[in-house]
Regions:
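Bacterial N-terminal signal peptides that target proteins for export
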Residues: 1-10
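Bacterial signal peptide processing site
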Residues: 22-26
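C-terminal motif of bacterial Sec signal peptides marking the signal peptidase cleavage site
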Residues: 17-20
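Low-complexity, intrinsically disordered segments exposed to solvent
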Residues: 27-335
Length: 335
């Protein structure tokens, strides 16, 4: 799974599942879940020649593979289309009228397709369309919608920006998502998420779609391990005028992970470029640890990648390692 496959999967996959669980009646509800208290950050990790490849792998997977950003897709939940399609579905549902003549309500508990339930509340300005300030909330209780996943926990959505036609694929949509004790179980694996995320999707200039995600703190639990991303800012640009789809990713964040024994700061200096399911063929990002030591990861094309390791923090590489994305990702798995 690479950039093109995952994008901002956790939230948009959730949106598509919400639509399925709501039975098409509509979506809704104020975001009124409990406050999120992220764990304090630890010290920046010490980067050495021996641990640099694993650190590079953990950072790389946040951007291009089984990332924190998309962790709810790693249990097999499908991402719908180009990522923006699931949000488009929500727009269409809203355009089709949530509950005619009703601007605020708590719907009767909805049965999910296979088992479990979902409670839906909403407070909207105009039930006939989506508009600024609309609020939706979903509380899932072991909801199995028939896609093989079971969802529990809360998801609140507030529309913070919208422009376009709800009946078309060309729109600008900005959402604030709040996840509380949100879990997805599939094939015996459970992933959880908690935090607040801001998302914007701009598909007004087809065939290009721009997706931006930001969060001050967001925690994911998977395989019994919790990781937190702080100060996340990521922009993904997809161009479907070519096949496979051309994807560009620009990002910065701080990651706190028990796999690292500390924190790392990650930022792209040149946007990562890829086609379809391939690894990035161009771009670079730098991982900074304690005492300004760093690892710069440079895409060389195909499966090739270079690690420039600055051990003393003087801005010049002390060690250069030419390796592969496959090996870098294997290092992350072993961390």
């Amino acid at each position: 799974m690479t950039i093109h496959a995952i994008r901002i999967g956790f939230s948009l996959a959730a949106l598509s599942l919400l639509a399925a669980c709501s039975g098409g009646d509509g979506d809704g509800g104020p975001s009124t879940f409990g406050g999120f208290n992220p764990p304090p950050t630890s010290q920046l990790v010490t980067i050495t020649e021996s641990n640099a490849p694993a650190i590079a792998g953990v950072a790389a997977e946040q951007i291009i593979e089984d990332s924190l950003i998309s962790t709810l897709t790693t249990t097999g939940i499908p991402v719908v289309g180009a990522g923006s399609l699931a949000a488009s579905d929500m727009v269409r549902l809203s355009g089709g009228s949530l509950v005619p003549g009703t601007a605020a309500a708590t719907l009767p508990t909805q049965d999910c397709a296979v088992s479990g339930t979902v409670d839906i509340t909403f407070d909207v300005n105009n039930p006939e369309t989506i508009s600024l300030g609309d609020e939706f909330a979903f509380e899932f209780d072991a909801c199995n919608d028939g896609a093989g996943a079971t969802i529990s926990g809360g998801l609140g959505m507030t529309v913070t920006g919208f422009n376009g036609d709800p009946g078309s694929d060309q729109f600008f949509l900005q959402l604030r998502l709040e996840l509380s004790a949100f879990t997805v179980t599939q094939d015996g694996m459970t992933a959880g998420a908690e935090g607040i995320v801001n998302i914007s999707i701009d598909s007004r200039q087809p065939p290009v779609t721009t997706i931006s995600v930001s969060s001050s703190a967001f925690t994911v639990t998977h395989g019994g391990m919790s990781e937190t991303v702080f100060d996340l800012d990521i922009t993904i640009v997809e161009d479907q005028s070519v096949f496979p789809t051309a994807v560009s990713v620009d990002t910065s964040f701080r990651l706190s992970s028990p796999r690292l024994g500390g924190d790392i700061i990650v930022a792209t200096s040149i946007a990562l470029e890829s086609f379809g399911e391939e690894y990035p063929y161009d771009g670079e990002f730098t991982i900074t640890g304690d005492a300004s030591a760093s690892v710069t990861v440079i895409a060389l094309g195909g499966d090739s990648v270079r690690l420039e390791i600055d051990l003393d923090g003087d801005g010049s590489p002390d060690v250069t390692v030419d390796t592969t994305w496959t090996e870098v990702m294997a290092q992350a798995d072993a961390a």
